[in-house]
From Swiss-Prot:
CDD domains: AsxRS_core, EcAsnRS_like_N. This is Asparagine--tRNA ligase. Belongs to the class-II aminoacyl-tRNA synthetase family. Its main location: cytoplasm. Homodimer. GO terms for biological process: asparaginyl-tRNA aminoacylation. It comes from the Bacteria. It holds the Pfam family tRNA_anti-codon.
């Protein structure tokens, strides 16, 4: 007999009713009495467990009643309806064999565990209800991202993980070397001699695939990347990780408004896809993680995102009369408390803030006619703050070079990026979406460490 997945039992219940099936999976709970036992089994294919009924007539009944949680089993039995129970069916076992025993000291017992504790056993936490739901949603959301862009003719491109350029110009990068740290070669000037290193020059882990993606956008028109990025920021907060995933589309012949339209459509598409394809997981989050989750997501999907300039945002915050921890004045980078006030108290929906001061944005963002601001925009959402940052890119070579000089960037490091402006340059735009940020928003999880399988944060690179 072929194996039947538990997902099939739930999605096609009538097809299996009163028929014999064979499943395999891991024991989640065992409840026994003198003549019966109830075993919940999860096979990994579905969020919910299946209840298996054991009768004392089974030859290994006593052994089965003593199974520790997480024992792997193979079950044969008849699917039968349960009209008065929470689950629509159960399996009356005719045979159960133990495939692999678990230990009685298995850490995930029936009691509820804190997310903090589960982070210490990241190799086991996917087996818990909460993280089973999180990582199923992560998989569906990743698929939805690809589906959105592929259906709109975008070309998926892979950008390098190891790079010699700093996209953000911030310098907070992880450096790579194969040199002996106890005997680092030096130049005559006493500086590190990178010519002796593996790549012959300094190399780092990428902070963004944007610059490389721009090269492909100027050949394929519309492209996107989706991969890991790394920031050596010593930010030990619930919203920052040292390794995370970024979605970065780049669009040729596109202005700032084209980016805004695309980003709004994409966010709504991904949320809708997850809501439709993970109803059980989303119901779990709405019940046990964030009781207002459905209302919040419905508001996002069904509202038109507000668009205001940075200057307008500053004026609104100053007029609010609220005493923020960080004082609001023109020229500062908006903090999370400012972003959340705009989205939660003033507009009560997602907000694009555009046209930021050039001094707080990256060198590649297009300078506006006022000479003080750039054609940049961040998407702010209720409950989280910023989840997307992007801009129209600076296509004018002379303006771009002047901007790099102002920021003391070495133009030789970006020679290939500058050269793009010489050969058929056009206006183009793009943005970056932190994948974990939108996962936090969709699931209601409040810590980035809980939406990525093995979080990497300052002082922690376990597993």
């Amino acid at each position: 007999m072929d194996i039947t997945l538990v997902k099939s039992l739930y999605r096609e219940t009538e097809k299996h009713m009163d028929k014999e099936v064979k499943i395999n999976g891991w024991v989640r709970t065992v409840r026994d009495s003198k003549n019966f036992a109830f075993v919940e089994v999860n096979d990994g294919s579905f969020f919910k467990n299946v209840q298996v009924i054991l009768e004392s007539s089974l030859e290994n009944f006593k052994e089965l009643c003593k199974m520790p949680i997480s024992t792997s089993v193979e079950v044969e039995g008849i699917v039968q309806p349960t009209p008065n129970a929470k689950q629509p069916f159960e399996i009356k076992a005719t045979r159960i064999s133990i495939e692999g025993k678990s230990s009685t000291d298995y850490p995930l017992q029936k009691k509820r565990h804190t997310f903090e504790y589960l982070r210490t056993i990241a190799h086991l936490r996917p087996r818990s209800n909460a993280f089973s739901a999180v990582f199923r949603v992560r998989s569906l959301a990743a698929y939805a991202v690809h589906k959105f862009f592929q259906e709109r003719g975008f070309v998926y491109t892979n950008t390098p993980i190891i790079t010699g350029s700093d996209c953000e110009g911030a310098g907070e990068m992880f450096q790579l070397t194969t040199m002996d740290l106890n005997n680092i070669p030096k130049t005559e000037e006493g500086k590190i001699d990178f010519s002796k290193d593996f790549f012959g020059s300094p190399a780092n882990l990428t902070v963004s695939g944007q610059l490389s993606a721009e090269t492909f956008a100027l050949a394929f028109r519309n492209v996107y990347t989706f991969g890991p990025t790394f920031r050596a920021e010593n930010s030990n907060t619930a919203r920052h990780a040292s390794e995370f995933w970024m979605i970065e589309p780049e669009m040729a012949f596109a202005e700032l408004t084209d980016y805004l339209d695309n980003a709004e459509d994409m966010v709504k598409f991904v949320i809708n896809y997850v809501m439709e394809n993970a109803p059980e997981e989303m119901a779990f989050f709405n019940s046990f993680v964030d009781k207002g989750l459905f209302d919040r997501l419905d508001n996002v999907v069904n509202s038109d995102f507000k668009r205001i300039t940075y200057t307008e945002a500053v004026e609104l915050l100053q007029k609010s009369g609220v005493k923020f921890d960080y004082e609001v004045e023109w020229g500062i980078d908006l903090q999370t408390e400012h972003e959340r006030y705009l989205t939660e108290q003033i507009f009560k929906k997602p907000v694009f803030v555009t046209d930021y001061p050039k001094d707080i944005k990256a060198f590649y963002m297009r300078l506006n006619d006022d000479g003080k601001t750039v054609a940049a925009a961040d998407l702010l959402v209720p409950g989280v703050g910023e989840i997307i940052g992007g801009s129209q890119r600076e296509e004018r070579l002379d303006v771009l070079e002047k901007r790099m000089e102002e920021l003391n960037l070495n133009k030789e490091d970006y020679w290939w990026y500058l050269e793009l402006r010489k050969y058929g340059e056009t206006k183009h735009s793009g943005y970056g979406l932190g994948f974990e940020r939108i996962l936090m928003y969709i699931t209601g999880m409040t810590n980035i460490r809980d939406v990525i399988p093995f979080p990497r944060t300052p002082g922690s690179a376990e597993f």
